[in-house]
């Protein structure tokens, strides 16, 4: 496999930091775009000399586009998670999710990036029959009138 230049949005988050470490172990180059509002720089201290870190908000189109120059693949993890935030800050949740994803899509088009990986959540399975749960488990649509689930 050819070494690639990856952009990981949300790369200082729990999952993002782990993915960045794995990509480096596989010989890839890693750029992280994160504003650290929920992530922690401490998660990437051991790899900070091997990565390029760009502090920025996923809603800032100029910052997103700057981070996507010379990138081969994007792993988009920059979302706000946690049930309490869906109730406390629903406008912010929606703003980050929608504007962030639109900026990523636009950047992929502008820079002709053909690989884009998006993350989801175990919430799409509600209460699964099998744990651990894999992608063969049927998705369950929750009550769409609950603000937490009404964004789709």
PLM regions and their residue ranges:
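N-terminal Rossmann-like NAD(P)+-binding domain of SDR-like oxidoreductases, especially those catalyzing
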Residues: 1-152
């Amino acid at each position: 496999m050819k070494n690639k230049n990856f952009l990981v949005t949300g790369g200082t988050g729990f999952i993002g930091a782990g993915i960045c470490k794995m990509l480096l172990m596989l010989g890839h180059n890693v750029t992280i775009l994160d504003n650290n509002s929920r992530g922690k720089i401490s998660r990437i201290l051991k790899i900070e000399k091997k990565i390029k870190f760009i502090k920025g908000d996923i809603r800032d189109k100029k910052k997103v586009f700057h981070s996507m120059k010379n990138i081969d693949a994007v792993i988009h993890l920059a979302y706000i998670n946690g049930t309490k935030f869906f109730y406390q800050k629903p406008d912010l949740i929606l703003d980050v999710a929608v504007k962030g994803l639109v900026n990523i899509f636009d950047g992929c088009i502008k820079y002709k990036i053909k690989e884009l990986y998006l993350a989801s959540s175990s919430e799409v399975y509600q209460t699964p029959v099998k744990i651990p749960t894999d992608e063969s488990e049927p998705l369950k649509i929750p009550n769409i009138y609950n603000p937490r689930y009404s964004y789709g």
